[in-house]
From Swiss-Prot:
Its EC number is 2.7.11.1. It comes from Xenopus laevis (African clawed frog). Serine/threonine-protein kinase involved in different processes such as apoptotic morphological changes, MAPK8/JNK and MAPK14/p38 MAPK signaling pathway. This is Serine/threonine-protein kinase TAO2. Belongs to the protein kinase superfamily. STE Ser/Thr protein kinase family. STE20 subfamily. Keywords: ATP-binding, Coiled coil, Kinase, Magnesium, Nucleotide-binding, Serine/threonine-protein kinase, Transferase. It is an enzyme of class 2 (transferase).
Length: 1025
């Protein structure tokens, strides 16, 4: 049935055949509610067709989560229909009426937990073995049919009148094994069920764990950790060691049986079939063990109910003159004597029990509480008013007939004393059908169960909400995994279509590339000629500007130097005027001669530089044409391998795309899982904090009640002290009178007056002392009682705080463990995916390498012939340059004149047409380093190392040093830069054209002859546009 079907919809034939069409209200009579649970209510009923007593479990599927409730009903009905075994509850049918399912099952006396509730003591080892053996046989039947119960506990192990043990409450069962849902009752859950969503699936061995916990429950009256919050118990079970039997009086067989069931690792835990052969179950025991236990329990229940009934009867009809305290005390003594006679325990349970929260009524029936308390009286009165005693255990029913026998006369009928004959007739009718309503539960137990169900609705709703959240998280993860899988399949289909479409476009692309190449070749040729002219004009303009700047600079320097010389002559007054003029004339001639020589040198260097740059430019153009030829050949060769190259590149790209999608899917899945775990942890923490708050509030309410009750207690103690002092005063008064009479009798009458006065003073003094003692006793009692109450309440509060803090720390440790496990799982999944992707990538690269090697031989031969031809052309050009006077170094390196020459850099938009169009080209085999790229580099010109000779006549400096320095600098680039702190950079010099593809060592080599795999491994392919 689809999970999204409307609740109660019977249009699906498979669902409709699960339910009978009859009206259940017409088939079953005498319905009486005998239990209540989170699923609904359990009723006793009688089938009017055959007078058979049955149990009816009513489950509503309206309101909140109606679809989920409906699915749970369908699942339970399907499960019960499959059961055919003596140790499982018998299913009789299911009916629908007004959004409520009536699940009819066989009637049982009660559950194993009822035995503990009635007797208030653990079962004997022989009885535990018998009950466990029967339950294990039922579990073995389920497990052999790939079914899991998932809620095994004493409250779900039922007993019948013939002494059979049956499994009940299959609302949590799973038809398929393994399973991965978070279901069950917390205290009995196996660790793998608690960690179901985090670690994966589990099988029927979870029932073996629950059976081990149930064995401890039968041996110790409650399961381990039962005094702990249910949520805290989950965290404790998940991360701590397995529980063991506390007492040492149990046999070694029993202890070994429990230890075997509670193996923490599921693989180490035996199966149900293996456990059936355990020595603990195979030991000899009487066949009537369970029968005797049931009979003993029924007798105890009957007598306890009689005592409770007589107690209520006397309370209602006691005479006014008789004090109620006396009657109550007598009844309590009578009950106590009976319990001692039957071997039961009458002490009240001091520990507060927390009912386990399952979807069945047995979850509440397994809580450990006292037999009779004051809160049960009102419930029992109401039940007796209805004329019945009702009990329940899980989906089976345990009943009490209407109280019409000799001990259940209706206390609310005043005329009952006068109607003995009618009562006797009812008692005889009841006794005839007594066996149909036998039970092993007391009325007070049923009442308390209903009260606990109402009081603990918050806890039950919290746990059910937590289970519902865990199931929703699992469904969400499964839906996400299915969605990602379908998305990956669609992605693969889309890639296949893309590859086919790309292959069909290869022929059209080849034709377009050929036409585009021809247009580029023509454009390169025209552009090269235009740029050569612009290049020459640019150099000439820069040289002219440099010459003008030099002439203007010489004029300025000449004037400055002339003024300096005149000042020097004026300072030297001792020199004759004629000598001064001759010396001045010589300085002027020397300066003019130096400037003329400097101008001639500049013109010579400019001419050399211009010729060299033009020759270099032509060589660059030749290299650019060679590169273009290489592009032509490359295009021609690529016509044969373009399809293969692009196909391989596309395969690699598709591989990368698929890899990226897989990693993204894994990241999304892990992020979703982490987010769900974070939400789960927040919910767990919120539940724990809410539980802590509720416990503290309950303690505060208890303390407030104690504080309110304290004045009454203090008043009673004060009255007690007052009575003690009154008695003391009376004694002293009697003693005073006796002493007075004695003295008056033994002394003369004349001394009587003085004696009376002395006795009166003595009496007054003693009474004053007694009054002081009374006041002191009262004050001491008040202060002691107040201090004792404060200390007691503070101790209780601190004890509660410590307990709650431990539970919170347990939760934090559990959540940390889950987070560490999740992170490790995510890391493991990531490594596995990386390994799969790496293997797939290696296989793809191997195939591409084999395909590319087949084309490489032909390609290498064509390239070799082209490179030989281009090398011959370069050699011829270089030979012509040598004939014209240009060295090979001058054409391929930085010219010597460039170190003394400064030109302005061309504008930013200056094109460099000789630059090859492609980024990678073949080398010619001719070494060609080329000039460095200097046009676009801002440079600085170092200041001249020689001054203009501003020294007076007779100094060691002379102007002749300047031209020699300049000359040496122009003749050797290395000498010009060797004596300076750093390499002399050029300022305003035109940048030589950058080298072509064959221009230097950095570009040497064959781009297509390099490893094809190294280029394709990065997911790239060559661009031929």
């Amino acid at each position: 049935m689809p999970s999204n079907a409307r609740a109660g919809n019977l249009k699906d034939p498979e669902v409709a055949e699960l339910f009978f069409k009859d009206d259940p209200e017409k088939l079953f009579a005498d319905l009486r509610e005998i239990g209540h649970g989170s699923f609904g209510a359990v009723y006793f009923a009688r089938d009017i067709r055959n007078n058979e007593v049955v149990a009816i479990k009513k489950m509503s599927y309206s309101g909140k989560q109606s679809n989920e409730k409906w699915q749970d009903i369908i699942k339970e009905v399907k499960f019960l229909q499959k059961l055919r075994h003596p140790n499982t509850i018998e299913y009789k049918g299911c009916y629908l009426r007004e959004h409520t399912a009536w699940l009819v099952m066989e009637y049982c006396l009660g559950s194993a937990s009822d035995l503990l509730e009635v007797h208030k003591k653990p079962l004997q080892e022989m009885e535990i073995a018998a009950i466990t053996h029967g339950a294990l046989q039922g579990l073995a039947y389920l497990h052999n049919h790939n079914m899991i119960h998932r809620d095994v506990k004493a409250g779900n192990i039922l007993l019948t009148e013939p002494g059979l043990v049956k499994l009940g409450d299959f609302g949590s069962a799973s038809i398929m094994a393994p399973a991965n849902s978070f279901v069950g009752t917390p205290y009995w859950m196996a660790p793998e069920v608690i960690l179901a969503m985090d670690e994966g699936q589990y099988d029927g061995k979870v029932d073996v764990w629950s059976l081990g916990i149930t064995s401890i429950e039968l041996a110790e009256r409650k399961p381990p950790l039962f005094n702990m919050n249910a949520m805290s118990a989950l965290y404790h079970i998940a991360q701590n060691e397995s529980p063991v039997l506390q007492s040492n009086h149990w046999s070694e067989y029993f202890r070994n049986f429990v230890d075997s069931c509670l193996q923490k690792i599921p693989q180490d835990r035996p199966t149900s079939d293996m456990l059936l052969k355990h020595r603990f179950l195979q030991r000899e025991r009487p066949q009537t063990v369970i029968m005797e236990l049931i009979q003993r329990t029924k007798d105890a229940v009957r007598e306890l109910d009689n005592l409770q009934y007589r107690k209520m009867k006397k309370i209602l009809f006691q005479d006014t003159q008789n004090g109620p305290n006396t009657e109550t005390t007598e009844e309590e003594e009578e009950a106590e004597q009976f319990l001692h006679c039957t071997g039961t325990i009458t002490s009240m349970e001091s520990s507060q029990s927390v009912p386990s929260m399952s979807i069945s009524a047995s979850s509440q029936s397994s809580s450990v509480n006292s037999l009779a308390d004051a809160s049960d009286d009102s419930g029992e009165m109401a039940m007796m008013q209805e004329g019945e005693h009702t009990v329940t255990s899980n989906s089976s029913v345990i009943h009490r007939l209407p109280a019409h026998d000799n001990i259940y006369d209706d206390p609310y009928q005043p005329e009952m004393e006068a109607q003995q004959s009618s009562s006797a007739a009812r008692r005889r009718a009841y006794c005839r059908n007594r066996d149909h309503f036998a039970t092993i539960r007391t009325a007070s137990l049923v009442t308390r169960q209903i009260q606990e169900h109402e009081q603990d609705s918050a806890l039950r709703e919290q746990m059910s909400g937590y289970k519902r959240m865990r199931r929703q998280h699992q469904k969400q993860l499964m839906a996400l995994e299915n969605k990602l899988k379908s998305e990956l399949d669609e992605h693969q289909q889309r890639l296949d279509k893309e590859l086919e479409a790309h292959r069909s476009n290869f022929s059209a692309e080849n034709e377009k590339i050929s036409k585009k190449h021809q247009a580029i070749f023509e454009k390169e040729a025209k552009g090269g000629m235009t740029e050569e002219k612009k290049f020459q004009q640019h150099i000439l303009g820069q040289q002219k500007k440099e010459l003008t700047n030099l002439l203007e600079s010489q004029k300025r320097q000449y004037k400055i130097r002339k003024e300096q010389l005149k000042e020097e002559l004026q300072e030297n007054q001792s020199t004759p005027k004629r000598e001064k003029q001759e010396w001045l004339l010589r300085q002027k001639e020397s300066m003019q001669h130096y400037q003329a020589e400097e101008e001639a040198n500049l013109l010579r260097r400019q001419r050399q530089y211009f010729e060299l740059q033009c020759r270099q430019y032509k060589r660059k153009m030749l290299l650019a044409r060679h590169n273009l030829d290489q592009d032509l050949l490359r295009e021609e060769l690529n016509k044969k391998q373009t399809q293969r190259d692009l196909e391989c590149a596309m395969l690699l790209r598709q591989h990368e795309c698929t890899q990226e999608l897989e990693f993204r899917h894994l990241q999304l899945l892990q992020h979703t899982r982490s987010e769900l775990i974070r939400m789960q942890h927040q919910t767990e923490l919120g539940n724990q904090l809410e539980y802590n708050k509720r416990r503290e509030q309950e303690l505060r309410q208890k303390h407030a009640a104690e504080v309110r009750q304290q004045p009454k207690s203090l008043k009673s103690k004060e009255l007690q002290i007052k009575r003690q002092f009154q008695d003391t005063c009376k004694i002293q008064t009697r003693q005073y009178k006796a002493l007075r009479n004695h003295l008056l009798e033994t002394t003369p009458k004349s001394e009587h007056k003085s004696i009376l006065k002395r006795l009166k003073d003595e009496q007054t003094r003693k009474l004053a002392i007694l009054a002081e003692q009374y006041d002191h006793s009262i004050n001491e009692m008040l202060s002691t009682q107040a201090l004792r109450l404060d200390e007691t309440q503070e101790a209780e509060y601190q004890e509660l705080r410590i307990q709650l803090q431990k539970e919170l720390e347990l939760l934090n440790a559990y959540q940390s463990k889950i987070k560490i496990h999740t992170d490790a799982q995510h890391e493991r999944e990531l490594k596995e995916l990386e390994q799969r992707v790496s293997i797939r990538r290696a296989l793809l690269e191997q195939r591409i390498e084999e395909e590319m090697l087949a084309l490489q031989t032909e390609r290498s031969e064509r390239i070799r012939s082209l490179l030989e031809r281009q090398a011959r052309e370069i050699e011829a050009f270089d030979s012509e340059s040598m004939r014209l006077g240009f060295s090979n170094m001058a054409l391929t390196g930085i010219p010597a004149e460039a170190f003394n020459q400064g030109y302005q850099a061309p504008p930013p938009g200056w094109p460099s047409r000789p630059v090859p169009r492609s980024g990678s080209h073949w080398s010619h085999g001719v070494q060609n380093t080329g000039a460095p790229q200097l046009w676009r580099q801002p440079t600085l010109l170092a200041p001249p190392s020689a001054s203009w000779g501003l020294h007076p006549p007779g100094s060691s400096s002379s102007l002749s040093a300047l031209p020699s320095s300049s000359s040496s600098s122009s003749s050797s680039p290395s000498s010009s830069s060797g004596g300076r702190p750093g390499l002399l950079l050029l300022r305003n010099s035109p940048q030589p054209l950058r080298r072509g593809g064959s221009g230097g060592p950095s570009e040497a080599g064959l781009s297509r002859s390099t490893s094809v795999t190294s280029q394709l491994s990065n997911g790239s392919h060559l661009s031929y546009s």
